Amino acid sequence: MLTKRIIPCIDVDLDEDGNPAVYTGINFEDLEYTGDPVEMAKQYNMAGADEFVFLDITASAVGRETMLETVSRVADEIFIPLTVGGGIRTRDDIKSTLRAGADKVSINTAALETPELITTGASAFGSQCIVISVDARRRFDEQGENYLSVDGESCWFECTVKGGREGTGIDVLEWVTEAETRGAGELFINSIDADGTQDGYDIPLTSAVCDAVSTPVIASSGCGSPADMHEVFTEAGADAGLAASIFHFGEYSIEATKEYLDERGVPIRT
């Protein structure tokens, strides 16, 4: 059985002085300064993280290039796989980000706007380098294609872009199957509804995606405890659990999380 991965993630933006800084928020809003990206990456590397995710959260929205200098500094300090997302729009952007030290790139907005980018990237650099990120939001209307029962109500999940700021009308389950067909090596599923709440992952969303594809799925948003990771692994079938707040603020350590999962029979990397 494949081991499950524990992945801390930092959301990076420019502070008032134009310096890269880590921010944490709720539902993609109310962002608060959390720390320095390079220092936090070093700490997670030493803490036993299986991988590390660096997301430039405003590059796509404002049309700015990804912070490649900061990516390089992070890559120099860690010895675990590094995924970088935000502002990646072209084949050259993928190439530049990988050259800066990333092992994988996470693409959201550009892939939805130009799906051929997935095919091109996978062909040029290998599917293992191409992670398709999906910022999903629940919609309780009649415009979707695949409906799920969530808390007694029928809803569908819409792909959003520009850091969750804009809807697309595209059904998440339709999109992930297309992304897989085009060569995506992993799917990074963010729930805007669960983001930062620490109330648990969006199990209906994650489970539906895992059922729809065979590509590895990284569950993101809402983790508040090791029990939430246990649930998303055992109930939804996720291959990896991403978390931010619970690790950033020291509520739980990666070591304690792995011990909790191991004691309950979840295969993890030691």
UniProtKB/Swiss-Prot annotation:
Catalytic activity reported: 5-[(5-phospho-1-deoxy-D-ribulos-1-ylimino)methylamino]-1-(5-phospho-beta-D-ribosyl)imidazole-4-carboxamide + L-glutamine = D-erythro-1-(imidazol-4-yl)glycerol 3-phosphate + 5-amino-1-(5-phospho-beta-D-ribosyl)imidazole-4-carboxamide + L-glutamate + H(+)
Active site residues of this protein: 11, 135
GO biological process: L-histidine biosynthetic process
NCBIfam families in the cross-refs: hisF (TIGR00735)
Known pathway: Amino-acid biosynthesis; L-histidine biosynthesis; L-histidine from 5-phospho-alpha-D-ribose 1-diphosphate: step 5/9
Localization per Swiss-Prot or TrEMBL: Cytoplasm
Species annotation: Haloquadratum walsbyi (strain DSM 16790 / HBSQ001)
Identification of the protein by name: Imidazole glycerol phosphate synthase subunit HisF
Record's signal peptide: none
Oligomer and partners: Heterodimer of HisH and HisF.
Keyword Amino-acid biosynthesis tagged: yes
SUPFAM superfamilies listed in its UniProt record: Ribulose-phoshate binding barrel
GO terms assigned for molecular function: imidazoleglycerol-phosphate synthase activity; lyase activity
Key words, A-Z: Amino-acid biosynthesis, Cytoplasm, Histidine biosynthesis, Lyase
EC number in record: 4.3.2.10
Gene expressing this chain: hisF
GO cellular component, one term: cytoplasm
Family of the protein in this entry: Belongs to the HisA/HisF family.
Function: IGPS catalyzes the conversion of PRFAR and glutamine to IGP, AICAR and glutamate. The HisF subunit catalyzes the cyclization activity that produces IGP and AICAR from PRFAR using the ammonia provided by the HisH subunit.
HAMAP family linked: HisF (MF_01013)
Pfam hit, one: His_biosynth
